[in-house]
Amino acid sequence: MEFSTKALDWSKAGQNGFLATKTDCLVVGLFEGQNLGGVAKALDVATKGLVGRLVKQGDFEGKRGTHLMLHEVAGVGAARVLLVGLGKEADFTDKAFADAVRTAVRALSSTRATSALWCLAQQAPQQRDVSWAVITTITLVREAGYRLLERHPGLKRANAQNAASGKPNGNDKSSLRKVVIAVDSGDARAATQAAVRGTAIANGMELTRDLGNLPSNICTPTYLANTARSIAKRHKLKAEILGRKQIEALNMGAFLAVTKGSAEPPQFIVLRYDGGGARQAPVVLVGKGITFDTGGISLKPGEGMDEMKYDMCGAASVLGTIQAVAEMGLKLNVVAVVPTCENMPSGVATKPGDVVTSMSGQTIEILNTDAEGRLILCDALTYVERFKPAAVIDVATLTGACIIALGHVNSGLYARSDALADALLQAGRRAMDTAWRMPLDDEYQDQLKSNFADMGNIGGRPAGSVTAACFLARFTEKYDWAHLDIAGTAWKSGAAKGATGRPVPLLTQFLMDRAA
């Protein structure tokens, strides 16, 4: 889908003005109430009071979540006019704006419209600027239009069979191909940059969703490594992929312990984007890449285990984020690090009670092989010390306990530094990809005590997400660090099953803020 921005003079709406633009659909927002303003007022004048009459007669009240499609409206160049309800102006929040965008996309998806002049960006919430409105519009429109993995042969065959039998396949794309986002003339430059950034973020989210949604027999550790190579080649990043022998040479005993049960070779992926100059310390993103998690010898229940292909969504989001950063050309140095493997049971798999030595030299008693994410991450967190990072953020579908604590709304955020935590929280709010800060009190560390090693890899049922973060904290004392537990936000179950692309919006906004 192609997005662009266009600066319009709202005082010249009709005749040769923007309302005369030839397009398949003109999208206009209306607040609830009798008073028309902005684009709605201009449209009303150009159509000789049509909009006002619709409101007065109660045919369209502008209530949130509602819409009205008009066809062949006199005085308008568009084939259709879509009126979108914005609700009460006093209650027009970020979420209300997002709801309006989604309402418009749903309405357009039931038509054959291929192009739209989008006049909602000027009606962003008061505290938001045009850049926010444009980026949010693009990411939400692309998110709503996402369809799963059509390039893969197996899915193509299934789609062809469904089409032949008249069955819906869930991969039918809407007709919309071109969206022109209208902005005020004074916002032209900011809007143009925002369109580039919004497209990059949407591309990163789609990559993240694709990788997460792929079945684990396709998206193996090797597949992730090849994806990283492809990103590096397209965007001129530096790529280094370490195999088993190199991982062994680095003494990554914790990571290797997880890999033992699987026939799939582990990979350790490093991508470097150098946009900030040689002297700038990089921000390092570390993503958990368990491409399938059975739990190992501590086997998970069979029901719902298919969703454990999503246990690499941390890795997927890190790859999606660095791709977005490269597409945006941010003046920032960013490193993406992904330890990736499967967690499988076998005759040679790691057993509960085994003791291993991590890259840091600290020993770990593996009390539960299903607490494997922290084992691959701890060695990665030691490895990244060599970059002398400005900050390190690890991203992982780490604990079911985080879902119990926060549900599927907020990602769990852990950080020692208030400044880093606040920056991430603020970025999440702006990107509508929110997180909630969780505790890291030293008292929780007591739960990780072991009689046979420096620590156990679990701390019991109480505060399970917290103790997992406390485990990681032991390997991050040499730099500023934050941990995002995305177990509740990386994918959805049920009818809407699939990867969400989170926390790419949060991470990209955080990096844009640092680069500003």
From Swiss-Prot:
Which cofactor does the UniProt annotation name? Mn(2+)
Pfam families according to UniProt? Peptidase_M17 (PF00883), Peptidase_M17_N (PF02789)
Q: Which InterPro entries match?
A: Leucine_aapep/pepB (IPR011356), Macro_dom-like (IPR043472), Peptidase_M17_C (IPR000819), Peptidase_M17_leu_NH2_pept (IPR023042), Peptidase_M17_N (IPR008283)
According to its UniProt record, where is this protein located?
Cytoplasm
The GO cellular component terms are: cytoplasm
Which residues take part in binding Mn(2+) 2? K288, D293, D311, E372
Co-factor: note: Binds 2 manganese ions per subunit.
Reaction equation(s) it catalyzes: Release of an N-terminal amino acid, Xaa-|-Yaa-, in which Xaa is preferably Leu, but may be other amino acids including Pro although not Arg or Lys, and Yaa may be Pro. Amino acid amides and methyl esters are also readily hydrolyzed, but rates on arylamides are exceedingly low; Release of an N-terminal amino acid, preferentially leucine, but not glutamic or aspartic acids
Locate the active site: K300, R374
Kind of enzyme, top EC level? Answer: hydrolase
Question: Do you know which SUPFAM superfamilies this protein is assigned to?
Answer: Macro domain-like (SSF52949), Zn-dependent exopeptidases (SSF53187)
Q: Which GO terms describe its biological process?
A: proteolysis
Q: Where is the signal peptide?
A: none
Q: What family is this?
A: Belongs to the peptidase M17 family.
Function recorded in the entry? Presumably involved in the processing and regular turnover of intracellular proteins. Catalyzes the removal of unsubstituted N-terminal amino acids from various peptides.
This one is known as Probable cytosol aminopeptidase
Organism this protein belongs to: Cupriavidus taiwanensis (strain DSM 17343 / BCRC 17206 / CCUG 44338 / CIP 107171 / LMG 19424 / R1) (Ralstonia taiwanensis (strain LMG 19424))
